[in-house]
Amino acid sequence: MELWDLYDENRNLLGKTHVRGVPLQEGEYHIVTDIWLVRPDGKLLITKRHPKKIWGNMWECTGGSALAGESSKHSAARELAEEVGVVADPEELELLDTIRIKDRFVDTYVVVRNLETADLTLQAEEVIDAKFVDFTELNQIWQDNNLVPRERFLQYREALRNFVEKNKKANN
């Protein structure tokens, strides 16, 4: 049973937990983290969701819900390790964006690693494929309706593009 901490609309901890899968009450929110792994050459890691999951066979960045008692950064680092086998210190993660959407606060992080897909260990029940794409390819996947969740990506797309470009310049 997965438990989440609950927050109010101002992201103040409510002092109660919630069981995943049970609808939230109005005014209750939980934290979700997205994490983009970016290579020094500017390519981004995307993973393909397991076909039995909601949005199955679609591409996404790594992410998930923060567990009760877990900080946003620790959640992102845990999801990165669980889903693709990449260990990162939470303090290495750079917050790219925070948005409140529906019943959640979504914190989007980036971390830079010089990896190939062969370096990854995919979590079989979550992820069936992974690849590194440049920003143009990523945008095309989004335009083709093959990247989820669509509305979140649209919110931080320019911030992600700027991070990728800045990172590429710093590594050339």
Regions found by a protein language model. Name each.
Residues 1-34, 38-40:
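Acidic, metal-coordinating catalytic segment for phosphate/diphosphate chemistry
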Residues 4, 28, 43-44, 58, ...:
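A residue-level structural signature of the nucleotidyltransferase/glycosyltransferase Rossmann-like core
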Residues 6, 37, 46, 110-111, ...:
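Conserved hydrophobic "DFG−1" position in protein kinase catalytic cores
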Residues 10, 39-42, 50, 112-117, ...:
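Short loop segments at secondary-structure junctions
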Residues 14, 94-96:
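Local beta-strand/beta-hairpin segments that build beta-sheet-rich folds
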Residues 18-21, 56, 68, 97-172:
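Nudix hydrolase/Nudix homology domain
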Residues 32-63:
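A glycine-rich, hydrophobic loop/mini-helix early in the fold
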Residues 45-46, 61-94:
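The catalytic Nudix box helix
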